[in-house]
């Protein structure tokens, strides 16, 4: 009872029995914590309250799925010196920036599509003139989709790409898989510009180092939506004894 009372005092509200279990594991347990609960059950609030239980000399990363959630978290948590609140993409951007030794990275969401449109004839033996306008645009879209899906899933073989084709019901016209894999090689070598998927893909595929982005505690909100590339990026941020506290709802997963 004494331990429960102390937790209530520290988190400054009366938690449910489930939250008490989480908070006790935070303070007295070891290893990682996964909180699975339905939408509206207070997962994010539980994570925020859990921050109060961590000593101020511990470095904390709190990752959210998008910028709007980050802004909300910043309002609720306030400015706490040892807590770094950001999206996973923002984390990846910073890691790429530091590893490439540049003060600013140019962001171009059209990086891959523009390259494909300008260089497609060098990647394919297909007679592009034989494709009608609708088929041609679908062909381009298929390549771009595959490049995105492959990067998010850290897929770099034909077999892995084909699995993604089936999973996402992509109706192939011809050699889209081969082109996607080749364009990804170009993307690895051309890092003057990055798109948002590059931010979480490049740190993994180029074996980048965390360079100051290592934390004692790593929180992940809406963790069911993290892609393989995003999860692997977060794993780069651990150090000896780091703990991961993830919250999510598998029934809401978009991946």
Short names for language-model regions:
Residues 2-103:
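P-loop NTPase Walker
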Residues 36-47, 57, 65-68, 86, ...:
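Conserved helicase motor core of SF1/SF2 NTP-dependent helicases
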């Amino acid at each position: 009872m004494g331990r429960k009372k102390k937790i209530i005092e520290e988190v400054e509200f009366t938690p449910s029995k489930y939250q008490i279990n989480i908070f006790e594991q935070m303070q007295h347990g070891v290893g990682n914590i996964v909180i699975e609960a339905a939408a509206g059950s207070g997962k994010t609030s539980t994570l925020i309250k859990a921050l109060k239980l961590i000593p101020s000399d511990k470095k904390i990363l709190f990752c959210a799925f998008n910028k709007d959630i980050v802004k909300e978290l910043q309002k609720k948590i306030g400015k706490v010196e040892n807590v770094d609140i950001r999206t996973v993409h923002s984390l990846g951007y910073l890691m790429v920036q530091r590893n490439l030794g540049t003060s600013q990275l140019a962001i171009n969401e059209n990086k891959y599509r523009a390259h494909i449109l300008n260089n497609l004839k060098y990647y394919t033996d297909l007679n592009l003139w034989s494709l009608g306008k609708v088929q041609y645009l679908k062909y381009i879209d298929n390549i771009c989709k595959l490049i995105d899906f492959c990067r998010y899933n850290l897929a770099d073989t034909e077999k892995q790409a084909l699995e993604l084709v089936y999973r996402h019901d992509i109706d192939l016209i011809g050699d889209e898989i081969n082109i996607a894999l080749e364009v990804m090689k170009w993307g690895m070598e051309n890092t003057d510009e990055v798109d948002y998927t590059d931010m979480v893909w490049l740190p993994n595929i180029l074996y980048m180092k965390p360079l100051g982005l290592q934390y004692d505690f790593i929180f992940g909100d809406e963790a069911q939506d993290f892609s393989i590339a995003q999860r692997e990026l977060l794993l780069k941020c651990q150090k000896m004894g780091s703990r991961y506290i993830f919250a999510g709802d598998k029934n809401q997963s978009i991946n």
